[in-house]
A protein has these predicted regions:
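Long, repeat-rich segments with strong aromatic
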Residues: 18, 41, 158-168
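Non-catalytic terminal regions with compositionally biased, polar/charged low complexity
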Residues: 167-338
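Broad, structure-driven detector of short, well-ordered beta-strand segments within folded domains
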Residues: 39-42, 104-106, 112-130, 209-214, ...
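Generic recognition of flexible, low-complexity loop/linker segments
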Residues: 7-12, 36-42, 52-54, 134, ...
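Hydrophobic residues positioned within well-ordered beta-strands of beta-sheet architectures
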Residues: 21, 51, 66, 145, ...
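Trp/Gly-enriched beta-strand surface patches
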Residues: 86-148, 298-313
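A surface-exposed beta-strand-loop module
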Residues: 140-157, 321
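Catalytic and substrate-binding regions of extracellular carbohydrate-active enzymes
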Residues: 1-88, 92-93, 101, 110
Length: 338
């Protein structure tokens, strides 16, 4: 059984509807220990935003791929084509490399859509391929529909981004792909995607999903913090927020963690926090505190004895301290004081 030396892997649940999953990868010593990556998945209703950073290895013989889908086509599924940028593809065998200078929209045989932004080398295929049966005792062959992002051989700090739309249609997929061509109509925005954090804004649910891969200190200037509050929570609650990397309300975390904050009615917010690191000591998960800092002054509308909400006397920020244990999510409702 393969075991990883990485402990930052797990998820967050938000209002029992949305969530986040993160996986920090380090290849096993018996396979390729040079392989590393950070993968995150942000789940909003039927939309999944998938991000990857820090993809690196020293394998100069094989290309590194991020699989979008790999569907075995039985007798009933074989006649079904995949849809590539609005055009059905039924041919067998078929393999196409898509233009990296364009965004692309794919639909697999099960009605799952994929939107891949520009700057990525995407391949799609429908062909016979060999594979091992589940007990790895013999080799089989079958017809598969596949799509993948090619990062090349021995990638160094490669990245990816794509959106998955569950149970969609060609018409709906085309409309959302067109909407993504403008930041004014995009259904999601990636505010940060680097070695420090993956942060995504979902327009429909008005939610911000955050994966902090490293600790983030409080900004040194009060003016920057005040500006974040005014732009994210405008004076009128009905106004839309100005969403940008400089306005995200979660401004500091003391260690890597997950957080999702959703705009509620009025000037309220629903905040979920989780630490996927189980903090295992002698084989048991041990509780430990985690402090997350928000711009502005907040009070808790859902008091919890294991949660402390404290407004800073020296800066317009609120420190929220929760007890994390066994990877569970801590959720609370906050109200903006001013």
């Amino acid at each position: 059984m393969l075991r990883s030396d990485q402990t930052f892997v797990g998820g967050l649940s938000h209002r029992k509807r949305n969530g986040i999953f993160v996986m920090r990868i380090h290849g096993a010593k018996h396979h390729n220990p040079s392989f590393r990556a950070e993968k995150t998945y942000f789940l909003f209703d039927n939309r999944i935003i998938c991000l990857g950073t820090g993809i690196v290895n020293d394998d100069t013989e094989h290309a590194t791929h991020t699989n979008l889908f790999q569907k075995h086509l039985g007798e009933q599924e074989a006649p079904q084509g995949i849809v590539v940028d609005g055009q059905a593809a039924h041919q067998v065998p078929m393999k196409r490399t898509l233009d990296p200078e364009r965004a692309h929209a794919l639909l697999d045989t099960q009605g799952t859509g994929y939107i891949i932004p520009t700057g990525q080398l995407v391949n799609v295929a429908r062909k016979n391929q060999k594979f091992r049966e589940q007990h790895d005792k013999k080799e089989l062959e079958g017809l598969f529909a596949t799509a993948w992002i090619d990062h090349g051989k021995a990638p160094s700090a490669a990245t990816y981004e794509y959106a998955v739309l569950v149970n969609t249609s060609p018409t709906r997929l085309a409309a959302l792909a067109e909407a993504m061509e403008s930041s004014d109509t995009a259904f999601y925005q990636v505010l940060q995607r680097d070695s420090v954090a993956h942060i995504v804004w979902d327009e429909d649910s008005r939610s911000l999903g955050c994966v902090f891969l490293e600790p983030v200190p409080i900004p040194p200037r009060k003016t920057e913090i005040t500006g974040r509050v005014r732009r994210w929570w405008p004076p009128k609650a009905t106004d839309s927020p100005l969403v940008s990397p400089l306005t995200q309300p979660i401004i500091a975390v003391e260690r890597p963690c997950l957080a999702m904050i959703q705009q509620g009615p009025g000037h309220s917010a629903i905040l979920s926090i989780a630490d996927p690191d189980l903090n295992m000591i002698d084989g048991l998960s041990q509780p430990r505190e985690l402090t997350v800092t928000l711009a502005g002054e907040w009070t808790s509308a859902s008091p919890n004895p294991s949660t402390r909400v404290r407004v800073d006397d020296n800066a317009p920020v609120t420190h929220i301290t929760v007890v994390c244990h066994q990877g569970r999510t801590v959720e609370m409702t906050l109200r903006k004081a001013r």
